[in-house]
Amino acid sequence: MSQALPLVTRQGDRIAIVSGLRTPFARQATAFHGIPAVELGKMVVGELLARSEIPAEVIEQLVFGQVVQMPEAPNIAREIVLGTGMNVHTDAYSVSRACATSFQAVANVAESLMAGTIRAGIAGGADSSSVLPIGVSKKLARILVDVNKARTTGQKLKLFSRLRLRDLMPVPPAVAEYSTGLRMGDTAEQMAKTYGITREQQDALAHRSHQRAAQAWAEGKLADEVMTTYAPPYKEPFSEDNNIRGNSTLADYAKLRPAFDRQHGTVTAANSTPLTDGAAAVILMTESRAKELGLAPLGYLRSYAFTAIDVWQDMLLGPAWSTPLALERAGLTLADLSLIDMHEAFAAQTLANIQLLGSERFARDVLGRAHATGEVDDSKFNVLGGSIAYGHPFAATGARMITQTLHELRRRGGGFGLVTACAAGGLGAAMVLEAE
């Protein structure tokens, strides 16, 4: 069993999150159509620095992520530094942990702060499902390499003659797990069947997510954490997420057919996250550095945990695995939390994790723990809606959740909050946040 692990520097400074910002999230091929992730990243980091009024030289490191990477910009972090007017000497590197990428970016900056190598940094992520690295078939790729080595026109023509029409078809990015061939939706279907989660339960959670997200926007709760953007042809501002269905009814969800298991499935496009474009980032500092600069932190990073499980069956159980570890490291229990924000990749996945957090059997037989993590209080859970409503630009979701949770904690007078997510490859992430 792990013990509480205080996240502080050698001088006893807490890790402060002083501000956070994101672009509005856009459904694939809508408001951000044609804008690559690196440009979305530049948008949000540039605006974050402008709003914070922090001198560029104060930021000593930028860790950024992108899941669907573009070959022409393999280090999105460095491109953001070079494209936003930041100090050219700012250290910058990129990370990828699938849907938990910006969780990892935040953890990396926090570790640099604790090590004392920096006193302030930026973490975040961006993804575009509208600008994708469309590839070629393996056969064509191999022949193109061989053609480059061929010496004569005859040799080149002979190589090209081996190709068939099907070899010339473009190859979009894979939507399946590399190691298993399973799509994420296939795993969600597995989980629905394993844990007895009905179509009605999934649709109800999705409807709840959209209703709460719509209410959050209507009440102005997201205005300070979402920037206004202008995308080509620069005629209209884009300032609110365009996936939220505030006027939908439960009956609307019931009309959709299963998207993965066509005959017996329960996972639909409406109770899953859509493909989305967007970016998000946060500024982290040591507590003393924030005080020197006269900054009031949004909150503090209390603990974090990353876990991994097998990918063949029910692999999206990351929250059920990582949450108890993060709570233990924070010296807290689930009951101590004021808010719980869980990434909604699919309604089925979300409901399965909620079920297992309260399962004594899962805790004992799978996690090797004496007691269940705890029953999730609905009044604390995804109170502003979740990814099913907002959308899910893979690398940006974690930073969105962190910023959103800290703002809501402050509105409620402070306390502790949990942000947690599943990720491809059987990975899981959880962070405990604190606001005063």
UniProtKB/Swiss-Prot annotation:
Its EC number is 2.3.1.16. Pfam families: Thiolase_C (PF02803), Thiolase_N (PF00108). It catalyses: an acyl-CoA + acetyl-CoA = a 3-oxoacyl-CoA + CoA. GO terms for cellular component: cytosol. Keywords: Acyltransferase, Cytoplasm, Fatty acid metabolism, Lipid degradation, Lipid metabolism, Transferase. The keyword Acyltransferase applies. GO terms for biological process: fatty acid beta-oxidation. Heterotetramer of two alpha chains (FadJ) and two beta chains (FadI). Belongs to the thiolase-like superfamily. Thiolase family. This is 3-ketoacyl-CoA thiolase.
